[in-house]
Design a protein with these regions (language model features):
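Bacterial N-terminal signal peptides
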Residues: 16-28
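Bacterial Sec-dependent signal peptides at the C-terminal "C-region" and cleavage site
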Residues: 25-39
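Beta-propeller-forming repeat regions
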Residues: 36-518
């Protein structure tokens, strides 16, 4: 799911004079009798002390040379708890004075950073030979503008007629919508108007046999520290109607799911509240409801840090008690497991599944899946967020975190894919193993030719742990979310993606890609 981290559009201005001065400053610090390598090592130690005190040390080569001063300014405002000046960073930050410790290490970063990041890996043309072909169908909400920000799509048989329905959220127009993607109907229908919904889950919270909806409400489209977010329980009523209960006063809520964590028979609500800089947490709302018309929940804060973008309940260690896995973005860039201690008081033991190598990793989402079919649960992780700085990064991609029986999991990079935002595993080609479908979203405004970047792709598992890349859609990646399922009942897996308008209007809200496997 998508979490916009700041209003996109970084400044294109580059201060060539300042860069030259910074590089010269770095060189000039080398004193008499001190080798260049020794001086560089001293600078690096100082950089680790200054830039590694709040998060993992960011090496200079993760950003181009011209971006580092803007990055330092951004970090300064975060560290000081202040809002940055309004406007393109390159212009707005020009007169900002950095603190002494940052001024001292900035020349090191500028001198060691590349002029430009390396070009992203090239991907096959969609017309290249592939084991599968896909046919696109476009779905939209009648009367709505072509500027959707579809943050989540989910396929589920909501009305229990044996066919998959589509549920989705649009965080710009403020809609929860539904559709029948397997039919000839191209119209999506509004279920509810909610200001900025980010995520939707189906669960029977009151255990009355009728499916309910859980909606994560952000409160505002663009990031800010506030308490305008909400957890919304849309209680299922007769004839497909819903009654909404708002549990408000939250930071920006990124996702919510239901599971019984204390063993009392009532589904509790697990909440990933992304927040922004000062706000945000991971929490469980203990379900104390006796009368569904008067919901009652008690909050148990599990992790007080901001940046949780997704949370999935699961009995990870198979002891009969519900645990959960969450992904902390922001400066943390960590996948965490919270193992239920079984004390009935919502106590968990935190375990690190994976910690990214640096704080600019761009974590964007994960799926829990047994990718190697060895009987345990692995993590399929994507990291491709560009909404902090708009820069297309060659190290963004898809990772398999293999569960080998302990923590952390073992990391395998499966493919590099700029802007990758979501990946899911399924047997797309019908050969018995799991393949991967991935979609990408870029903030726009980069200096990379976006016509050459994949927007939707699939990875064919050709042998255990080895994947061949195939492009379904090329150019202008604008998909924050996807889901997989057999929409037409022909026995193979089709793809549904949500569209996220960045700049020009788009022709549809949701695209269905029908698998043409013979």
């Amino acid at each position: 799911m998508l979490i916009v981290r700041r209003p996109p559009r970084r400044g294109e201005w580059r201060a060539a004079v300042w860069l030259g001065a910074a590089i010269c400053a770095a060189a000039a610090v080398v004193g008499a009798g001190q080798s260049s390598s020794q001086q560089t090592a001293d600078f690096q130690r100082q950089a680790r002390a200054t830039c590694g005190s709040c998060h993992a040390y960011p090496p200079p080569d993760i950003l181009p040379r011209g971006s580092w001063r803007d990055e330092f300014v951004r970090m300064m405002f975060i560290r000081e708890g202040r809002l940055p000046p309004i406007g393109p960073p390159g212009l707005a930050n020009r007169s900002v004075q950095l603190p002494a410790d940052m001024e001292q290490v900035l020349p090191f970063y500028v001198s060691q950073a590349p002029e430009r990041l390396s070009a992203p890996d090239s991907w096959p043309d969609p017309a290249a030979p592939s084991p599968l072909t896909f046919t696109r169908r476009a779905l939209s909400v009648p009367g709505m503008p072509g500027t959707p920000a579809v943050s989540h799509v989910r396929l589920i048989d909501l009305d229990e007629d044996g066919k998959l329905d589509l549920l989705g959220t649009d965080m710009r127009q403020g809609l929860v919508f539904t559709g029948t993607p397997g039919s000839v109907t191209t119209a999506l229908a509004e279920i509810a108007s909610i200001p900025h919904p980010a995520h939707i889950t189906v669960a029977d919270v009151d255990k009355d046999g009728v499916q309910d909806l859980l909606v994560a409400e952000m409160g505002e489209f663009f990031p800010a520290d506030h308490a305008k977010g909400a957890v919304i329980w849309m209680r299922g009523l007769a004839k497909g109607k819903f009654g909404a209960f708002w549990l408000d006063g939250w930071p920006r809520v990124a996702s919510v799911d239901a599971a019984d964590f204390n063993g009392d028979g009532k589904p509790d609500l697990a909440v990933a509240a992304f927040g922004w800089r000062k706000t945000g947490s991971v929490a469980i709302l203990e379900n104390r409801t006796d009368n569904p018309s008067r919901p009652s929940f008690t909050t148990h804060t599990i992790d007080k840090r901001a940046g949780s973008i997704q949370l999935v309940p699961i009995d990870l260690n198979r002891d009969g008690r519900m645990d959960f896995v969450t992904l902390l973005a922001q400066e943390h860039e960590t996948v965490l497991a919270y193992i239920n201690k079984g004390t009935g008081d919502f106590s968990f033991e935190q375990k690190v599944i994976y910690a990214a190598p640096h704080p600019n990793w761009g974590s964007s989402g994960f799926e829990l899946v047994d990718l190697d079919k060895d009987g345990d649960v692995d993590v399929l992780l994507t990291h491709g967020d560009t909404f902090d700085d708009g820069i297309v990064k060659p190290y963004h991609g898809i990772q398999w975190l293999e569960n080998t029986g302990g923590f952390p999991f073992v990391e395998h990079t499966l493919a590099q894919m700029p802007g990758v935002h979501r990946a899911q595993a399924a047997d797309i080609d019908g050969d018995g193993d799991l393949d991967i479908v991935a979609t990408a979203l870029l903030a726009g405004g980069s200096d990379v030719d976006e016509t050459t970047l994949p927007a939707l792709a699939w990875l064919e598992q050709t042998k255990p742990g080895v994947f061949a890349r195939h492009t379904i859609e090329m150019g202008f990646p604008r998909h924050a979310t996807l889901d997989l399922g057999d929409l037409d009942g022909d026995g193979d897996i089709d793809v549904v993606v949500g569209n996220f308008s960045v700049g020009p209007a788009v022709k549809s809200w949701v695209d269905v890609w029908v698998n043409g496997r013979k």
